[in-house]
Amino acid sequence: MVLDPTQKKSVIDAHAKHEGDTGSPEVQVALLTARIEDLTGHFKEHKKDFHSRTGLLKLVGRRRNILNYLKKTDVQRYRALIEKLGLRK
């Protein structure tokens, strides 16, 4: 599902590196995580919505690719982001 503009702005403000930052890996991963969490709630009610489930898997893959890029380039930022979003154990 799509985030409404107020939710999107709050996620961007929480993870932006500087004013107007919408493209850093941290912001991209945070936005994808918010969309993934929204879709996960959707699937609790609509268990047989397989078409949306394929979209969810694409979002998870995109987030994984961005996280891999961040891990390759800057491990400190990667670990901080994982901790902040609570993505790993």
UniProtKB/Swiss-Prot annotation:
One of its GO terms (molecular function) is rRNA binding. Keywords: Ribonucleoprotein, Ribosomal protein, RNA-binding, rRNA-binding. Residues 1-24 are annotated as: Disordered. SMART domains: Ribosomal_S15. Residues 1-21 have a biased composition (Basic and acidic residues). One of the primary rRNA binding proteins, it binds directly to 16S rRNA where it helps nucleate assembly of the platform of the 30S subunit by binding and bridging several RNA helices of the 16S rRNA. Forms an intersubunit bridge (bridge B4) with the 23S rRNA of the 50S subunit in the ribosome. This is Small ribosomal subunit protein uS15. The gene is rpsO.
